[in-house]
Amino acid sequence: MVTYGELLEIIGYTLVENDMTETICRHMDEYRGEYTNSIFGLFLEISKGLGLVCKGIEMQAFVQVGTLLRQLYEQIATAIVLQNHPETRKTFNDLSKIKTELITTNKDKNDASETLYNQKKDLISGQPRRRDFFEYGWLLEIEGCHSLGSRELLKQANLFDIAAWKEFFNNFVHNKILAIQMTDEGMSFYTNEFVYHAAIIFDRFMCAYHQATDYNFHIAGRSVRFDFENCFNEITKQRKS
């Protein structure tokens, strides 16, 4: 029977032991462009984040792992939407620059932020908070999209079925669940769940990265993607039985 440990080994082997960072940086130089850099930057953060998740699971650092997985779901969703909707990339970059300037100057708004907000605010259902607009306003470039927030982002990335789990991970972000409070059964349960959610993100990462670069995830004569899909599918069947 395939185990969660085998699934985790494949993810760690791909991202940590074989330094996926070097591969992504090489492809970033090869496909360099004003807007593609944002996508490859996300790929880089996802790869590093999943590598940390693998190490964190081994260390039973559950609070850190839960926090990382919550962030990684948003990052992979963002990469998928930017990849599938090129019309969003300019606004995404514009908002990223504005956010960076606001953070570094410790301001809530500036001329650039107000101009962009006033241009787009009528497209949004309800009364949006400026913070949500600067985080997710680029989604408005998608035809028919009038909502902002992480749930809308996951929906646009076809990841809406895990929205409830993403919210659950907030419990770790806010230290509501600590490993020291868990029974052995609880630790086993969360370890398996963390591995499975890391696998979901890794699966989407491989698909998106292959779409962007044609990279086939063959490493040292091993078809990592083939091994992973077999293991992931078997674990998924076990979970449904």
Which residue ranges define each predicted feature?
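A cross-kingdom marker of C-terminal helix-rich interaction/assembly modules
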Residues: 1-241
